[in-house]
């Protein structure tokens, strides 16, 4: 809905967003301007088993002024495109968040991701800021959690364990190097 220009009817995800208040979205085709809420997004990332679901469920009890979402609710095989760093999936989420923001509520989005995956999306321009919190834990604890999960989740397979341990390590080593930086939260205990 917000990608269609009320002035000329053109569809674009590349509207210019003004920096002055009130924020306006400007159609590149006809220069029509409309008011636009540009709110922050809070991304909670981490390897499987790092505590994202537990944190989300605990946060739900306090969620009156923000919306909590899990990125997995939109996942399907059509988004499985590692060759482009899952760009369509990430951009779809930013479009969803942009639309939710128009109701005046910021979003807390849970799911495994890196700042680069969101910051490089065209829909990123519509968000005032993205804050990244990375949940991490000690490798032995992460492995224990994944192995103890129900078998149907296939979390304890050797391949999955290695992928999650590697991602957890990457987050720990790179949180201060990403742009923007990620805040680390150790969930070991």
Where are these regions (language model features)?
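Cys/His-rich microdomains that often coordinate metals
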Residues: 9-12, 34
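Conserved substrate/cofactor phosphate-moiety recognition/catalytic segment
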Residues: 56-98
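Conserved glycine(s) of the Walker
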Residues: 51
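Small-molecule kinase domains that catalyze NTP-dependent phosphoryl transfer to phosphate-bearing small molecules
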Residues: 152-189
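Short cysteine-rich clusters marking metal-coordination/redox-active sites
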Residues: 5-8, 27-30
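Short linker/helix segments within small regulatory modules
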Residues: 15-25
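Conserved phosphate-donor/acceptor-positioning beta-strand/loop module used by diverse small-molecule
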Residues: 111, 125-148
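Hydrophobic anchor at the beta1->P-loop junction of P-loop NTPases
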Residues: 44
